[in-house]
């Protein structure tokens, strides 16, 4: 009989690494539907600064958020060099504007470090953990926590 319950066997996870606000982040690959070039959005009146507008993606109206601004960094002025990551959490589909997408990062669960506890704020809740890679600290985005307040505001 094969034993898969070995406590020493760590779960392998895959992330898409990205840059937002000049910082390195990653999102679990299973939460990403597609990655596309920046395209102009339709503005929504009275939206928060991080809600850039909406796009029509194959018949679906998708809100586009500036990830850097949502995380408390300076807003991005979109150019053709920027990228939109279309994410899916449960039934929610949202586009995130980022500066760039780098690579796919494979990591064992034991590589993930706990996010240091500071004042409870949106940024702290939005980061699930940190993966040290060389001199770089890649923050894992908790899309569920990040999008919870954003979608209520954008709707």
Describe the function of each predicted region.
Residues 1-155:
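An acidic, low-aromatic, low-complexity terminal/linker signal
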């Amino acid at each position: 009989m094969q034993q898969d319950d070995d406590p020493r066997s760590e779960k392998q996870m895959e992330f898409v690494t990205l840059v937002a606000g000049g910082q390195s982040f990653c999102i679990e690959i299973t939460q990403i539907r597609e990655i596309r070039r920046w395209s102009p959005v339709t503005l929504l009146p009275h939206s928060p600064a991080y809600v850039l507008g909406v796009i029509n993606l194959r018949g679906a109206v998708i809100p586009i958020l500036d990830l850097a601004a949502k995380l408390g960094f300076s807003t991005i002025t979109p150019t053709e060099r920027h990228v939109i990551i279309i994410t899916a959490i449960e039934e929610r589909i949202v586009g995130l504007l980022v500066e760039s997408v780098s690579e796919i990062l494979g990591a064992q669960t034991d590589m993930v470090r706990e996010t240091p506890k500071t004042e409870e704020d949106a940024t702290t809740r939005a980061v699930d953990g940190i993966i040290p890679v060389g001199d770089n600290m890649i923050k894992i985005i908790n899309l569920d926590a990040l999008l919870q307040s954003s979608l209520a505001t954008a709707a």
